[in-house]
């Protein structure tokens, strides 16, 4: 049986984003940008796709007068990443 790989997560930049968010409760947009070496626009585009899939929650707020964007995996996103990891492990097993 062929593994079912989530193509949304399989894209390298989105995989990096999901992996970063998987190990923390939440993260600031700029922190994720630095960790992944993505540009502001590129990260924003990938976050939009993950947000539309309900994998990531995006919360925009102000800290004092500074805008802040916090990112967090949703339960659906966490489950999808868990499943992706399982499918990749199965796909890479030697017969």
Explain the meaning of each model-derived region.
Residues 2, 19, 79-95:
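Amphipathic alpha-helical dimerization/coiled-coil segments
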Residues 4-42, 61-64, 70:
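N-terminal helix-turn-helix DNA-binding core of bacterial DNA-binding proteins
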Residues 30-32, 44, 70-71, 84-88, ...:
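Surface-exposed beta-strand edges and their flanking turn/coil or helix-capping segments
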Residues 47-48:
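Short, hydrophobic-biased segments on the C-terminal half of alpha helices
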Residues 54:
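Glycine-centered, phosphate/nucleic-acid-interacting loop/turn motifs that mediate DNA/RNA or nucleotide
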Residues 58:
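Short beta-strand "wing" residues that participate in macromolecule-binding interfaces
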Residues 63-82:
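Basic, amphipathic "hinge/linker" alpha-helix immediately C-terminal to the N-terminal HTH DNA-binding motif
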